[in-house]
Amino acid sequence: MQIDDKLLTKLEKLSALKIADDKRQELEEQLSQIVNFVEKLDELKLDDVEAMTSTTNTATPFRLDESRKSDVIDMVSKHAPNSQDGFFIVPKIIE
């Protein structure tokens, strides 16, 4: 799949991002490389491969579930083009 200017413009609109004109060509190439890589992964024959939940046989220690004060929502919301009460406001894309 090739990422062209038409698709990049659609992605730009859906993501509410502004892509600088001097970065468009580079981004098209990078996205095309990512999509091509994923398409190659899709070609792998994995019918005889058992599903794995981890790549190692060791257990991962759990961290304590402690409540912490975080300003992540405020930080992310101030960079969003449109947000309200900690939520993103996005255009409707499904009819």
Curated annotation (Swiss-Prot):
GO biological process, one term: regulation of translational fidelity
Entry keywords, A to Z: ATP-binding, Ligase, Nucleotide-binding, Protein biosynthesis
Catalysed transformations (reactions): L-glutamyl-tRNA(Gln) + L-glutamine + ATP + H2O = L-glutaminyl-tRNA(Gln) + L-glutamate + ADP + phosphate + H(+); L-aspartyl-tRNA(Asn) + L-glutamine + ATP + H2O = L-asparaginyl-tRNA(Asn) + L-glutamate + ADP + phosphate + 2 H(+)
Entries under Pfam families matching the protein: GatC
Highest rank taxon of the organism: Bacteria
Recorded GO MF terms: asparaginyl-tRNA synthase (glutamine-hydrolyzing) activity; ATP binding; glutaminyl-tRNA synthase (glutamine-hydrolyzing) activity
SUPFAM superfamilies: Glu-tRNAGln amidotransferase C subunit
Keyword ATP-binding: yes
Keyword Nucleotide-binding: yes
EC number: 6.3.5.-
Oligomeric and partner information: Heterotrimer of A, B and C subunits.
Family: Belongs to the GatC family.
The protein's role, per its UniProt record: Allows the formation of correctly charged Asn-tRNA(Asn) or Gln-tRNA(Gln) through the transamidation of misacylated Asp-tRNA(Asn) or Glu-tRNA(Gln) in organisms which lack either or both of asparaginyl-tRNA or glutaminyl-tRNA synthetases. The reaction takes place in the presence of glutamine and ATP through an activated phospho-Asp-tRNA(Asn) or phospho-Glu-tRNA(Gln).
Protein name per the record: Aspartyl/glutamyl-tRNA(Asn/Gln) amidotransferase subunit C
Species of provenance: Campylobacter lari (strain RM2100 / D67 / ATCC BAA-1060)
Taxonomic lineage: Bacteria, Pseudomonadati, Campylobacterota, Epsilonproteobacteria, Campylobacterales
